[in-house]
Every structure is written in structure tokens, then in C-alpha cells.
């Protein structure tokens, strides 16, 4: 006998694919359908989901491609036998910062869709501009400089909007659009983020932006809970603030708000119930922290090619090197994010040098690296009072801190606070195995201090749990050092949701929005239903008394080292 309980869909519209994932009330995944843009689309000369204009550093996607993809994913779910009439709620996740420009006829086209035709056939004319800038776009340096200067400096911009200006952020992108294509801007009735674009298709009219994703624009004043009028003025230029406000629309506070019933088109074409509710879609990073009941002060570290650090926190302490967003479901919490360009690649450089020296040459094995790292004492200190070894290892230019590619090695004496740039006493590459992982983790601890609280029992402030995801999370030696530095009173866990974190987070958000009791938080409802044993495995201890405190001293030297390198680099220019 097949179950007839409610189902929920979470979509993930990323750079290279659209995914639709279906869960039941118990959060069990029952269907997944994917549409790979390069492999499955027709009529677009895209590569890895995007088009590029090298001359102007532009990277963008044809919006019509996403229309094709939505029909493609729903067809895939139909082939799998999904009973669409059981779907009670739909939410989504979209690649952050991207913008979609709707024409004046968009609302009427969305309302009058013919279910016998595809979305692409009917909506290609709904856009004043056929492309959406991608997060990899780097065409807005001039606009970023203006945004950074406009409120007095990058610190002031970060204080107001949660981030300093970045090429990919929507505000600088809209400013460039307004100047480069004034006629297009004039004809634009509404501007959506990728997430609210997806919700708009499902709803049949333009959906509001989500309270978390709106923080990736450099336009939303996070503390005031409203658009920053001065920044809107910069962005709108001669077209005026009121016009831009109309284009952007109001932003509801409640991340679980029922925006309305599903568009009739999907009821007729796929058999959805006309009572199916559409919920706000959020950004891909906010959706990632919804893929588990991440408690305030828990930390999530993605150890991929690059390193990303996510944390849910009640403390708003913005800085130009970090990002703050409103939490996607829980008022009073913020999502803190750090993005580094150097991650796995930097660790692999050291691994390869160690393997070459030991004669295992082209081997991709981590065995020697791990063994040496675990045999090396914390901070390479030979004695308790000996000097600490620390360094920066950047095979590619870094953004946190903002510095060119290169390597810098130092020793630091915590007793006298003396820092010396030197390679004396360094046994390379062996000493670098531990030093590279320590360098990456100390940077995370430095930038997240002040956001954690004591987990109780008289422990120093630290995360309750540290969750590791991505390729590097398979490495238990790295996990051990991560726990020694970052802490984690409950330990260090490997989170394994495959590459489905964003879609799962969106689906869980839909479950919460429809099934919550009055005042029930996302963390509470999902926490009761989430089957920990299916998704996580404890792979290392976290907090260790004495070791954690020693690394606290190392953080002070690490901060000093970064400042010295930045000063030296500024002098070189």
C-alpha cells in the first residue's frame, strides 16, 4: 500500500543545473529529478551553464534556459511517478546575487499561461533583458568602488548591508545595468533575484524577495529591516529611488510566509492540487544551513576547492572580510559567512610536495601528509615555551585577507608577542602539513570569535558542533586538527547530504512553513524530525582543554602576521 501523506518540493537553481527534490513530512527523500544545463538543454551555446564576454569580464545566463529547465525537472518527476496532487508546499534555493529583469507585460503573461505549451514558448518575451548576471561575473569594479565609498568606506557599507561591495552583488550589477542599458532599465517593471524569479514562475505573478537572500545585494539595511535609501539613490541614478523601490518590491519578514497558491498552469499541466502553497525561495548559501537543524553557534565548514564557513548566530558583528545575512527562517538570528579562494588546492600543493620528497611521486594519497601532520605538535612547538610556526599559503590570490598569491612563513613567541618572518627552523615541506591546516582553521577562528557563546559547563566560547562538508570532510586527520582549533563541545561531525544540501534545505523550509505550530521555529520542528544517524557521523573530538587555549594564543600571533603581510604588500605597491 502506498502512503498518501503530504509531500514537499525543494528546488535548487544553481549555475549548472536545476534540481527538484521531493520529501515527505518525515523528511524522507522520495524523488529527485535533475536538469543539467549543458547536457539537457537545447538552443543555447552555454558552457558550464553560462555565457561569457571575456572583454568586459561578464558572465551571465540566458533566463529562457531556466524556463526550459523547470519544465524539464517536472517532466522528470512525472516520469518517476510522482503524484503531484499530494504536494502541499514548494520552496526553492537560487544561486545568490543573480538578477532577472522583467518587462511590463510579465505579470499578464505569467497569469495567462496555456498548459498545452511550454514555459519557454510563452515567457521568453516576459523579460526586458534576456540574461541574468552570474555570481562569477567581475564586470563591476567601478560600481563596487562607488558603493564602497558611498557611505564613507567599506566598513560603513558592511555595517549597513552585511557585506562590503562585491562584483557579484546585485546592487553594483543593477547600477551597471542602469548605465549600460538605460533603455532596458527604463522598460524593466520588476527586478527579481534568482530565488524570487523561481517563486514567481510557480506563483503566476512576481514573488517578493526573501528576507535572507535580499542581504546579498548591498542594498538592504539589515539592522533597519528596510532598503537603504542612500544606496538606492546611488543605484537608481537619474531614474530615482521610488522607481527602483517599485522594481524591487516589498520584502516580507516571515521566511515561511504562504505567498499564495500554485499557478493554474502547473495544476493543469502536471496535476498539482490547486491548494498547493508557494513559499519564499531563498539563496543557495542560506538554504545550505537549512539542510540540518543548525543551532545558533554551530559551525559548518565546507572543505572544497575553496573553503566556506557558515554559522548561525544572534550576534551581528559585520566586517569587510565577512558576510552577514538575515537568517532565512528565524528572526533574531543571522547567517555569518566566510568565503576563501584557497582551500583544497593549497592543501594538495603541500601533499604533493611531501609525496614527491618521500618518493611516492604522482600519488594522490593523503597517507604521508596525514601521518606527518598528526606527528607534528600543535603550531610546530618543540617545547611548551618554544616558538610557534605559522604561515600563509596562497597558491591563488586570496580575498580573506585581500592579498596576492604567495607563501609567507613566520615564527611567533606568545610569551613576548614577538613575530619574525623567517624560514629558519622550518623543515619544508613536512612542517607545512600541519601549518597549512592550522593556517586555514586559525583564520576561521579569528574571524568567528565574538560570535560564539559558551556551550555551558564553564567552557570557553566555541561552537557546540562543527560540521564538515565537501571533499576534505572525508579526511579524519584534518577533522582532528579542525576540532582542536575551532573547538566543538559536542565534537566534529561529517555531514553527508551529497550535493543535495540546497535542495534539501529548501524542501525542509517548505515542510516547516506548512506544518509548523504557531511560533514554532524551524530548528525545533526540523530538529524533532531530522534523523541524525542518516546524515552525520562523529569523526573527531572537538574541544580539548589546554590545546584550545594554546590555539587562542596562536590566534593573536596569526592576526598580527596577517596585518604585517598586508602592510608589506601595500608598501610594495
Curated annotation (Swiss-Prot):
Keyword ATP-binding among UniProt keywords: yes
Main location: cytoplasm
Annotated binding of substrate, by residue: 97, 168, 284-285
EC number(s) reported in the record: 2.7.1.17
Pfam families noted in UniProt: FGGY_C, FGGY_N
Gene3D superfamilies given in the database record: 3.30.420.40
Protein family: Belongs to the FGGY kinase family.
Protein name in UniProt: Probable D-xylulose kinase A
Annotated source species: Aspergillus fumigatus (strain ATCC MYA-4609 / CBS 101355 / FGSC A1100 / Af293)
Amino acid at each position: 500500500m502506498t502512503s498518501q501523506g503530504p509531500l514537499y518540493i525543494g528546488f535548487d537553481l544553481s549555475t549548472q543545473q536545476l534540481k527538484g527534490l521531493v520529501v515527505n513530512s518525515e523528511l524522507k527523500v522520495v524523488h529527485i529529478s535533475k536538469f543539467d544545463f549543458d547536457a539537457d538543454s537545447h538552443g543555447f551555446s552555454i558552457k558550464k551553464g553560462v555565457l561569457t564576454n571575456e572583454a568586459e569580464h561578464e558572465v551571465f545566463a540566458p533566463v529562457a534556459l531556466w524556463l526550459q529547465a523547470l519544465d524539464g525537472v517536472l517532466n522528470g518527476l512525472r516520469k518517476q511517478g510522482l503524484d503531484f496532487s499530494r504536494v502541499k508546499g514548494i520552496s526553492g534555493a537560487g544561486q545568490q546575487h543573480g538578477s532577472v529583469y522583467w518587462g511590463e507585460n510579465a505579470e499578464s503573461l505569467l497569469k495567462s499561461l496555456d498548459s498545452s505549451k511550454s514555459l519557454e514558448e510563452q515567457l521568453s518575451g516576459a523579460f526586458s533583458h534576456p540574461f541574468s548576471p552570474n555570481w562569477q561575473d567581475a564586470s563591476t569594479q567601478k560600481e563596487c568602488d562607488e558603493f564602497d565609498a558611498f557611505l564613507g568606506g567599506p566598513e560603513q557599507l558592511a555595517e549597513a548591508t552585511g557585506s562590503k561591495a562585491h562584483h557579484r552583488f546585485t546592487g553594483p550589477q543593477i547600477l551597471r545595468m542602469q548605465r549600460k542599458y538605460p533603455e532596458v532599465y527604463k522598460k524593466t517593471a520588476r527586478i527579481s533575484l534568482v530565488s524570487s524569479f523561481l517563486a514567481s514562475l510557480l506563483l503566476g505573478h512576481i514573488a517578493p524577495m526573501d528576507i535572507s537572500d535580499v542581504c546579498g545585494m548591498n542594498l538592504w539595511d539589515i539592522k533597519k529591516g528596510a532598503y537603504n535609501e542612500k544606496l538606492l539613490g546611488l543605484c537608481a541614478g537619474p531614474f530615482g529611488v521610488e522607481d527602483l523601490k517599485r522594481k524591487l518590491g516589498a520584502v516580507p519578514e516571515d521566511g515561511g510566509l504562504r505567498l499564495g497558491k500554485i499557478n493554474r498552469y502547473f495544476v493543469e499541466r502536471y496535476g498539482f492540487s490547486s491548494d498547493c502553497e508557494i513559499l519564499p525561495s531563498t539563496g543557495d548559501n542560506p538554504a545550505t544551513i537549512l539542510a540540518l537543524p543548525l543551532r545558533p553557534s554551530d559551525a559548518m565548514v565546507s572543505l572544497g576547492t575553496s573553503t566556506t564557513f557558515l554559522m548561525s548566530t544572534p550576534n551581528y558583528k559585520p566586517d569587510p572580510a565577512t558576510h552577514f545575512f538575515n537568517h532565512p527562517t528565524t528572526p533574531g538570528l543571522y547567517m555569518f559567512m566566510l568565503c576563501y579562494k584557497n582551500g583544497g588546492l593549497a592543501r594538495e600543493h603541500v601533499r604533493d610536495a611531501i609525496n614527491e620528497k618521500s618518493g611516492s611521486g604522482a600519488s594522490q594519497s593523503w597517507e604521508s601528509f596525514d601521518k606527518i601532520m598528526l606527528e607534528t605538535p600543535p603550531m610546530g612547538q618543540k617545547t611548551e615555551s618554544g616558538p610557534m610556526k605559522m604561515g600563509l599559503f596562497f597558491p591563488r590570490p586570496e580575498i580573506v585577507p585581500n592579498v596576492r598569491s604567495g607563501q609567507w612563513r613566520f615564527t611567533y613567541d606568545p610569551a613576548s608577542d614577538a613575530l619574525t618572518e623567517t624560514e629558519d627552523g622550518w623543515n619544508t615541506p613536512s612542517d607545512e602539513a600541519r601549518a597549512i591546516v592550522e593556517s586555514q582553521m586559525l583564520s576561521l577562528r579569528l574571524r568567528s570569535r565574538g560570535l560564539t557563546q559558551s556551550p555551558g559547563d564553564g567552557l570557553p566560547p566555541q561552537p557546540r558542533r562543527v560540521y564538515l562538508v565537501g571533499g576534505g570532510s572525508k579526511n579524519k586527520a584534518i577533522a582532528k586538527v579542525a576540532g582542536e582549533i575551532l573547538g566543538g563541545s559536542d565534537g566534529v561531525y561529517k555531514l553527508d547530504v551529497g550535493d543535495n544540501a540546497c535542495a534539501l534545505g529548501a524542501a525542509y523550509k517548505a515542510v516547516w512553513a506548512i506544518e509548523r505550530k504557531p511560533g514554532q521555529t524551524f530548528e525545533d520542528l526540523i530538529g524533532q524530525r531530522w534523523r541524525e544517524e542518516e546524515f552525520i557521523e562523529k569523526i573527531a573530538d572537538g574541544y580539548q582543554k589546554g590545546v584550545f587555549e594554546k590555539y587562542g594564543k596562536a590566534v593573536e600571533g596569526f592576526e598580527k602576521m596577517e596585518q604585517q603581510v598586508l602592510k608589506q604588500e601595500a608598501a610594495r605597491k
